[in-house]
Amino acid sequence: MAHSHSGSVNYFESANKVIYEGKESTNPLAFKYYNSQEVIGGKTMKEHLRFSIAYWHTFTADGTDIFGAATMQRPWDHYKGMDLARARVDAAFELFEKLDAPFFAFHDRDIAPEGSTLKETNQNLDLIVDMIKDYMRTSGVKLLWNTANMFTNPRFVHGAATSCNADVFAYAAAQVKKGLETAKELGAENYVFWGGREGYETLLNTDLKFELDNMARFMHMAVDYAKEIGYTGQFLIEPKPKEPTTHQYDTDAATTIAFLKQYGLDNHFKLNLEANHATLAGHTFEHELRMARVHGLLGSVDANQGDPLLGWDTDEFPTDLYSATLAMYEILKNGGLGSGGLNFDAKVRRSSFEPDDLLYAHVAGMDTFARGLKAARKLIEDRVFEDVIQHRYRSFTEGIGLEIAEGRADFKTLEQYALNNQPIKNESGRQERLKAILNQYILQV
């Protein structure tokens, strides 16, 4: 049997608890910028950032890729089956404690293996959920969100809620039903829907409208069941444009918002936005965050980064200060993420295979967003962008512009104005100047 919650397990024995040592520190296992109790704008860094560790990349990923076998050296991997599942829970809560991480997130199949039947699978899940619940009680770590893996098993080859097979739709419903019960039991602050295989490869064999209708039916059923059992966490939907299907239905923030509004789901769902998925969609991360924010639908963040030179989801740990600063700017302008957080949906590189690399990676990501938070806060305090934007759009605060903004103008009055107007004069957007100022703020904090 694997160890249970006994306190005797020590999978990361070479590392002490990671503490804040300041930017002069040369200790790779110390925070240089993330000082959890430092107060910024009335909230601690811990409250602003709400860091979460992703169970799948951190404790189940083994480094396998399409060109090669597993590389990861994990001291718990000699266990099998349910013993392995238990050992991973021990390892997880040890790492949470060493990083002082307040939250974690998981797919159902990350934490417990599938059995030969759905009933057996659910029994496996119940055993591990009980163990996690014990650890949560004693550690104070909370569940940011859980979700259902409806993409790995071959039954989902044609999708889950968008499958052409009604038996698969029914199985997926049973799986999410269990997921919502798990969310309630563990006090998950959110529940995520990522349409792993909800999309298509070719329109030649696809009834696109029927699949979208079915996906909406599925989500309405989930909303109804959450109400029935009294689960009050925030529902989140996560956009991604492609991979594993050619065309994912929840392509990006704008597409997903249109879907939610079309099917009357926008009062029940917000968006869980991932940086790498924005890259795949041809957007900056801050574009996706802004799009969700202006629609009042920014819910949570999967903090990672992609490689713009590659056309697939690389899920690297976030170390780009520029992107992190602009992301935190959007989050602060949103008044925070509410029940959401910054979940490190990120994996160490295949060649970073030692257990300590998990610590180095999370320290890097946490420091990056701490620095981004401080720079973004200063930018907002100094109204760097706000004053520029206010000045740039000032023509809409008086005269004909004010008439337009207040809805008092029409095509006829605007034509009359245009006919009598002197030559139009535009002003420079001063983009380069703004980028230089942004760099200055990032470098100074």
From Swiss-Prot:
Its cofactor is Mg(2+). Gene3D superfamilies: Divalent-metal-dependent TIM barrel enzymes. Mg(2+) 2 binds at residues 274, 277, 313, 315. It comes from the Bacteria. GO terms for cellular component: cytoplasm. It is an enzyme of class 5 (isomerase). Keywords: Carbohydrate metabolism, Cytoplasm, Isomerase, Magnesium, Metal-binding, Xylose metabolism. It is found in: Cytoplasm. It catalyses: alpha-D-xylose = alpha-D-xylulofuranose. Binds 2 magnesium ions per subunit. The active site is at 107, 110. Its EC number is 5.3.1.5. It holds the Pfam family AP_endonuc_2. Its main location: cytoplasm. Mg(2+) 1 binds at residues 238, 274, 302, 345. GO terms for molecular function: magnesium ion binding; xylose isomerase activity. GO terms for biological process: D-xylose metabolic process. Belongs to the xylose isomerase family. Homotetramer. This is Xylose isomerase. The gene is xylA.
